[in-house]
Amino acid sequence: MTAIRIRTLALALATTLALAACGYTLRQAQPLPQVLNAVVIEAVNLDSLLVMDLERELKGAGATLKPLNTTGVSVLKIQEETAERNVISLDDRAKVGEYELHYRVVYAVDGADGQPLLRDTPINLSRVYSFDEQQALGAAQEEDLIRSELRREAVRMIL
């Protein structure tokens, strides 16, 4: 083996040992609460990306999704979903330098008996990102990526 290969292998081994020693583990799928094993999703917009992400995560965790108006199952209600973009800073030419994306979801959960288990629970997330007008296409892609990350984080918080 060459010296570079040995160093690379030694560095990888040292990093692995350091991570193991500090207790780091990869995030594992969290078990679903029992109440969400069979669930109906109600939302103002059932075609929203949030609802699609929720459905995918619920199915992946082993939940059974039931059609609307099914009785005897829990109901996950997405009552509000909003996304806003605000200007945070301007440069010396009064051009936008940074934006902040806000993402808000309000949800509730009713049990199979119709009793509220979780009432109007808000999730408020935000991220700041730099904007360069010289790279407007890249900035639009970055904004889309941040929006999808915020949505995925909201899904994790709901479940």
Where are these regions (language model features)?
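C-terminal motif of bacterial Sec signal peptides marking the signal peptidase cleavage site
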Residues: 18-21
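C-terminal/domain-edge helix-coil "capping" segments
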Residues: 137-159
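Bacterial signal peptide processing site
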Residues: 23-26
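Sec/Tat-exported extracytoplasmic proteins
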Residues: 43, 58-62, 109-113, 133, ...
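Surface-exposed short loop/turn segments
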Residues: 77-122, 126-144
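N-terminal segment of the mature soluble domain
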Residues: 37-82
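Bacterial N-terminal signal peptides that target proteins for export
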Residues: 1-11
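Acidic/histidine-rich, surface-exposed loop or edge segments in extracytoplasmic proteins
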Residues: 34-42, 135-139
